[in-house]
């Protein structure tokens, strides 16, 4: 028997909403057809409400004396062994010796995304240039059903609410907010909740050189939990 896909839901929202085009809304409900995008797609999109060239990144600055910076950087890398393998140790030591401020930009690997919102707002929907909205009446069962359809492409999924904040900040061991749910402050009206599927790839100091392609999946089971709001 196949192992069921893993899907973690942090908050069980009573309802979620998907802004879309009318033609796609009909396909979701009538055919169970869903388009699952990717994080790196948003880096290439120029649409005001959608595109973000810094999607999936998070920056850290290391302050203090060279000894303090070296200690904090060591802690930083211990929790990110994949990053340690990708950085140039000699260049780092030279920067510390020259008293040059140290910073890293962390890139999460490309991931599959299905973006929704926990609060319906028709004005925001129009900002997305959408003319339809799907109400997801049971987000937990919807997410589990869609995750089943995504099983061939990604083994693990989670539902997370986006946090609208600055991507760059001083290093702090408690500053563990994942890069894949950070969005700029000017988009906080979106109130986005993401379904994220990961294929357990590494975190990078540069962009993922093997980006994913969007998927079209079928799930009439997921469609059962959708109804047309607009």
Each language-model region and where it sits:
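NAD-dependent ADP-ribosyltransferases
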Residues: 1-230
């Amino acid at each position: 028997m196949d192992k069921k896909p893993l899907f973690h839901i942090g908050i069980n929202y009573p309802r979620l909403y998907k802004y879309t085009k009318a033609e796609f809304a009909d396909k979701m409900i009538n055919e169970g057809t869903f388009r699952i995008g990717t994080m790196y797609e948003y880096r290439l999109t120029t649409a005001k409400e959608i595109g973000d060239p810094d999607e999936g990144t998070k920056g850290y600055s290391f302050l203090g004396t060279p000894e303090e910076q070296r200690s904090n950087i060591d802690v930083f890398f211990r929790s990110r062994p994949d990053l340690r393998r990708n950085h140039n140790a000699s260049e780092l030591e030279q920067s510390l010796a020259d008293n040059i401020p140290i910073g890293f930009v962390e890139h999460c690997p490309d991931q599959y995304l299905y973006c929704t919102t926990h609060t319906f707002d028709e004005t925001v929907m129009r900002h997305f240039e959408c003319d339809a909205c799907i109400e997801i009446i049971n987000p937990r069962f919807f997410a589990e059903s869609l995750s089943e359809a995504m099983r061939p492409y990604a083994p693990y999924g989670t539902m997370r609410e986006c946090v609208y904040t600055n991507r760059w900040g001083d290093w702090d061991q408690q500053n563990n907010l994942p890069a894949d749910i950070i969005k700029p402050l000017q988009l906080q009206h979106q109130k986005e909740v993401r379904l994220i599927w990961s294929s357990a790839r590494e975190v990078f100091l540069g962009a993922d050189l093997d980006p994913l392609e969007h998927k079209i999946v079928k799930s009439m089971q997921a469609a059962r939990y959708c109804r047309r709001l607009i």
